[in-house]
């Protein structure tokens, strides 16, 4: 066939989709990462240079800074933080309907031209970028930053056939607490703890508040409607 390259972005590529493409078409899906404000690619795996679980290396000519996030440490030899970039592909700014003809530069720190992605990433010792989640999709529990997306992945590992979504709510003892919404009525803390032990992680990733739903609310794109779930907290 003529199909040579398949690149996935927008959300994390599941292992089941990756395996299905290899089995059916013999093609490895290459995962990438970007933003509309960056026209739109920031990092991508290539056929010759790829690492599973990452979104590849930053494109050439992209300067980057990882701003420290309190409660979030990096493994030895790696870097972790909130990603800011400066590059030729970063837009000049936004055109607002209510202010025609005026370019509103993106928020930045330091020199103009920087763009704050709003994403927390980890860059490993070989320069591969690993997306850990949106800043707004982290909770600070007992002083430690916990990725709500990573907690969702944990739920998927414990219950592959269910649908799961995680939010956080204020907690007097720990600052914030996890709330897991799931369509699997049999999913409990014991199965989540087992998944942590099997795949690695922290006890802080195990939700104490687990709520069963017949179906999770979704947007027109098929993604989870977190705004609707927040109304249930």
Predicted features, each with a name:
Residues 57-61, 72-107, 144-146:
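Conserved ATP/PPi-binding loop(s) of AMP-dependent carboxylate-activating enzymes
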Residues 64-66, 101-108, 119-123, 166:
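A structural signal for short hydrophobic beta-strand segments in well-ordered beta-sheet cores
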Residues 42-46, 67, 86, 97, ...:
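Short beta-strand-to-turn element immediately C-terminal to the catalytic PLP-Schiff-base lysine
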Residues 87, 92-93, 113, 118-205, ...:
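AMP-binding/adenylate-forming catalytic core of the ANL superfamily
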Residues 30-37, 41, 56-58, 167-170, ...:
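Beta-strand->loop->alpha-helix junctions that form or flank phosphate-binding loops
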Residues 1-51, 63, 70:
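Gly/Ser/Thr-rich phosphate-binding loop
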Residues 172-173, 209-221:
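Short proline/glycine- and acidic-rich turn/helix-capping motifs at secondary-structure junctions
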Residues 10, 34, 56, 119, ...:
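Active-site glycine-centered loops adjacent to acidic/histidine catalytic or metal-binding residues
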């Amino acid at each position: 066939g003529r199909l040579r390259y398949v690149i996935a972005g927008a959300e994390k590529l599941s292992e089941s989709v990756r395996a299905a493409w290899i089995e059916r078409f013999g093609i490895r899906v290459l995962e990438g990462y970007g933003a509309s404000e960056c026209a739109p690619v920031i990092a991508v795996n290539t056929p010759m240079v790829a690492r599973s679980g990452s979104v590849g290396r930053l494109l050439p000519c992209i300067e980057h800074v990882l701003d420290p996030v309190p409660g979030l440490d990096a493994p030895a030899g790696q870097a972790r933080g909130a990603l800011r970039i400066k590059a030729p592909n970063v837009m000049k700014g936004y055109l607002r309907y209510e202010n025609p003809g005026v370019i509103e530069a993106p928020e930045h720190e330091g020199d103009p031209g920087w763009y704050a992605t709003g994403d927390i990433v980890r860059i490993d010792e070989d320069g591969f970028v690993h997306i850990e989640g949106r800043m707004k999709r982290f909770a600070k529990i007992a002083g430690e930053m916990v990725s709500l997306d990573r907690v969702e992945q944990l739920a998927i590992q414990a219950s592959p056939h269910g649908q799961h979504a995680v939010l956080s709510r204020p907690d007097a003892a720990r600052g914030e607490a996890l709330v897991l919404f799931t369509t699997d009525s049999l999913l409990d803390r014991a199965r989540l703890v087992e998944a942590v032990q099997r795949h690695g992680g922290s006890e802080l990733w195990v939700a104490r508040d687990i709520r069963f739903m017949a179906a999770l609310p979704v947007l027109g794109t098929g993604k989870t409607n977190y705004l609707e779930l927040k109304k249930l907290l």
